[in-house]
């Protein structure tokens, strides 16, 4: 083995899945990968499944907390820093890679206090709190979207690490002579505004113009969403979740979804046109900024939730369904914006700082 690498990522799949892609790349290069996380995040399930040792510290976010929590915060941060320092001393990593989540704050500080090179990666077009703070002390800064951190000699625009199977190489079935295929993604929990909006919007389209629909509605909302389609007399297949995203992307001609960083990067990787409805209450409105990356180049249509009703969505769908060549152009533009070497580039940067 060439030494230990400590990856810090926690909370949501948007942080953990790109970090897992980097972990696999480190392993192929002969490094032993360890993971720093918390007991409350999705990493508790996914990291052991990947066969990686998981080290836990106690840390949580401060935004939106009450006064009592804020008073306790300095002591809790000190505790989490001491926990992270102990883990760093035990592992003696040759590099620490922070991929987002609250865990990266104390973990990144512990790494720098120990003199270990620290590389951070920001998945969103707007940097999270921990990464904004760590950018001041990080050895290198990786960003998925251009100019997230402004001008800095330490900054590199790498794109988001995504699963290699999403870079689809097989040509799509021609759109001529068949119904287009619409994939609706509500995320693992389901986006209820999308679950309500799509049946109503599709009901406004003439029957002959309606696409095939596969709608991932979330476990809690799948049954009621299917009922909405039936009530609207719109044919659709509704599922609580999708296990094989590569297959789903390969099936689709158009995607309607939120604008999480990983989703936006996956759409580009798959070369898919999209209608993006950013989560309106996302921290710092980062989903709107993510969506703009594709929309400003013509690879996506940005639809703010507050300004999008069934009639507006139906009009947007009518425009592309009556002019299918637009979908081909949007998809080609999305693929041009993809960064297929993102995972390798992030790991290359880590190796650069290891060598000093």
UniProtKB/Swiss-Prot annotation:
Keywords: Cell cycle, Cell division, Cell inner membrane, Cell membrane, Cell shape, Cell wall biogenesis/degradation, Glycosyltransferase, Membrane, Peptidoglycan synthesis, Transferase
EC supergroup of this enzyme: transferase
A molecular-function term among this protein's GO annotations: undecaprenyldiphospho-muramoylpentapeptide beta-N-acetylglucosaminyltransferase activity
Transmembrane stretches, start-end: none
Membrane topology of the entry: Peripheral membrane protein
Reactions mediated catalytically: di-trans,octa-cis-undecaprenyl diphospho-N-acetyl-alpha-D-muramoyl-L-alanyl-D-glutamyl-meso-2,6-diaminopimeloyl-D-alanyl-D-alanine + UDP-N-acetyl-alpha-D-glucosamine = di-trans,octa-cis-undecaprenyl diphospho-[N-acetyl-alpha-D-glucosaminyl-(1->4)]-N-acetyl-alpha-D-muramoyl-L-alanyl-D-glutamyl-meso-2,6-diaminopimeloyl-D-alanyl-D-alanine + UDP + H(+)
One annotated Gene Ontology cellular component of this protein: plasma membrane
Family: Belongs to the glycosyltransferase 28 family. MurG subfamily.
Function per UniProt: Cell wall formation. Catalyzes the transfer of a GlcNAc subunit on undecaprenyl-pyrophosphoryl-MurNAc-pentapeptide (lipid intermediate I) to form undecaprenyl-pyrophosphoryl-MurNAc-(pentapeptide)GlcNAc (lipid intermediate II).
Protein name per UniProt: UDP-N-acetylglucosamine--N-acetylmuramyl-(pentapeptide) pyrophosphoryl-undecaprenol N-acetylglucosamine transferase
Organism expressing this protein natively: Ectopseudomonas mendocina (strain ymp)
Gene label: murG
